[in-house]
Amino acid sequence: MAGVGDRLGPIILGEIGDIRRFRSGKALNAYAGNDAPPYQSGQFESRNRHISKRGNPALRKACFEVMQALKLAKPQDDPVYLFLLKKEQEGTPYNVAKMAAVNKFLRIYYARAMELYR
């Protein structure tokens, strides 16, 4: 995948481990701590939520580095890069757009890796 090189690839693979232990791409995002748990109190339900950061910090940092590499490489055919550009053009704050792109990156990674086991 674009943005993942000789250094970040082994880090991501090592931190994720066996991909079959996750039931979905959403579970992989939760493992990375890149999920936004719901916040509710009575009738109030928040729309502006922060990522949980309860997951693997090394994986989250490596994925953040992948997003920085994508910004530098600018691969025009990569869906994650195009998603990142779209979010930035919508006016989404820089780090929020990056974490949304990390979410998409991990879901695509999960789908491609699980194809090997089907």
Residue ranges and their predicted role:
Residues 2-90, 94:
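Phosphate-backbone recognition surface of nucleic-acid-processing proteins
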Residues 88-118:
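Basic, amphipathic alpha-helical segments enriched in Lys/Arg and hydrophobic/aromatic residues
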